């Protein structure tokens, strides 16, 4: 039988239409909507759940950390909590409390650590896989630090992580404009509860990155800041909705291993800091670089592009909120867990009451991307989402568990006080995450 080009073309178009209709008739849902509650607030109106952190031990044990805030937390009751799971996250055992916040768990040598801040940096150590813990040890004196449970990086026989110091204390609003992300390095076999076993990079405060940032930042053409954000108090785009002076916070550390990458260092002595960009807009992260010197010291500066121009902001889906970066060696890809913005252009004075603060501050859709270079991102899927903007799924941490990603989320349900002040810490599992690569 002979088929004309016209007949063949019509048959192909009909087939494509049927395939398309079939594809769109299927509901595309989140990758890991089902969850296990690791911690639930006993009083959602006065006790809030923050800073989920997760690590996997070589034994397969999962370690989770979180902290609590709000007027309902009794004085003297440790804000932080450690949990472990030996059944893949289906059930959790409370192991210890600790008197600091903004912490994350990590392994170094044969020990497990949790490092955070109670203004000063503090750390605890376990030598039995999280069952028992040392007394808290201070790493600084009379300083003011900040962070979230961002990533850790291993290289050169050391562990690297970032904490952020508030260096001036003169912003009378949210102080991210005066924060300096500080890369910290510790030897894997050393006792990391001792200050002398850590090396701190030099400090670069955000207020020292953009000329005239305090009055009229010398930066234009892509809307930074989005709302007026003058020092020292910022502005109110609408009642009870604050636009603090622009800044960076909640910083991850990455290292480029691809020799073709523009910022690859064959000596392995250059690290890059990827931070949440508080600008009032969406879709950008703020970055800096840290270079290790032969004497072991580390210097923090801005990165440059081939034109010689400095680069401070890069494309990053969800970069306006806390995000988590994980490098996966088998795929040689960076994985990004972040908050998806869907409605950042609604006027601040017309936002629904259950929307938290500024229009770019959506917190109820947790998304996953992958990238070969930390700039060009491919969407892998929604991880989980709340039923309403108040029911958050955000500030999540992740770790690799075999072929899966395990995720710990700062979450809320209908009882939560707000999208920011949630009442749950939830565990999620993205199965066979490497199959999402295309």
Task: Describe every region a protein language model picked out.
Residues 7-9, 80:
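Intrinsically disordered, low-complexity Ser/Thr- and Pro-rich stretches
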Residues 9-19:
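Bacterial N-terminal signal peptides
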Residues 24-148, 153-250, 254-317, 328-333, ...:
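Beta-rich carbohydrate-recognition and catalytic domains
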Residues 381, 394-395:
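Active-site pocket scaffolds in enzymes
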């Amino acid at each position: 039988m002979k088929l004309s080009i016209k007949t063949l073309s019509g048959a192909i178009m009909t087939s494509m239409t049927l395939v398309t209709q079939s594809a769109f008739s299927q509901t595309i849902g989140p990758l890991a909507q089902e969850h296990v509650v690791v911690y639930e607030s006993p009083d959602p109106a006065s006790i809030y759940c923050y800073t989920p952190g997760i690590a996997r031990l070589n034994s397969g044990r999962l370690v989770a950390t979180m902290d609590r805030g709000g007027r309902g937390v009794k004085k003297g009751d440790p804000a932080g909590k450690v949990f472990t799971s030996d059944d893949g996250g289906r059930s959790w055992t409370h192991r210890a409390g600790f008197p600091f916040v903004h912490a994350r768990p990590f392994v170094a040598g044969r020990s497990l650590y949790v490092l955070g801040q109670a203004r000063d940096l503090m750390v605890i150590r376990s030598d039995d896989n999280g069952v028992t813990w040392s007394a808290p040890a201070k790493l600084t004196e009379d300083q003011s630090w900040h962070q979230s449970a961002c990533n850790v990086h291993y290289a050169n026989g050391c562990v690297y992580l970032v904490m952020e110091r508030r260096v001036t204390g003169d912003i009378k609003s949210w102080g991210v404009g005066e924060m300096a992300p500080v890369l910290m390095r510790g030897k894997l076999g050393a006792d990391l509860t001792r200050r002398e076993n850590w090396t701190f990079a030099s400090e670069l405060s955000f207020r020292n990155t953009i000329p005239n940032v305090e009055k009229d930042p010398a930066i234009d053409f892509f809307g930074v800041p989005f709302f007026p954000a003058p020092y020292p108090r910022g502005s109110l785009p609408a009642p009870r909705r604050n636009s603090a002076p622009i800044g960076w916070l909640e910083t991850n550390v990455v290292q480029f291993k691809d020799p073709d990458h523009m910022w690859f260092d064959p000596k392995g002595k250059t690290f890059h800091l990827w931070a949440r960009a508080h600008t009032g807009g969406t879709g950008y992260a703020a970055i800096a670089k840290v270079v290790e010197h032969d004497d072991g010291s580390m210097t923090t500066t801005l990165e440059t592009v081939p034109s010689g121009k400095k680069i401070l902001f890069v494309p990053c889906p969800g970069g306006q909120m806390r995000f988590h970066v994980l490098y996966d060696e088998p795929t040689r890809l960076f994985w990004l867990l972040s908050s998806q913005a869907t409605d950042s252009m609604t006027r601040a004075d017309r936002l629904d009451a259950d929307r938290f603060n500024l229009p770019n501050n959506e917190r109820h859709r947790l998304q996953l991307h992958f990238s070969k270079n930390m700039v060009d991102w491919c969407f892998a899927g929604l991880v989980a989402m709340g039923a309403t903007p108040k029911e958050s799924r955000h500030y999540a941490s992740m770790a690799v568990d075999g072929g899966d990603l395990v995720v710990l989320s700062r979450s809320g349900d209908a009882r939560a006080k707000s999208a920011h002040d949630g009442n749950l810490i939830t565990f999620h599992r993205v199965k066979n995450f490497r199959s999402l690569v295309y």
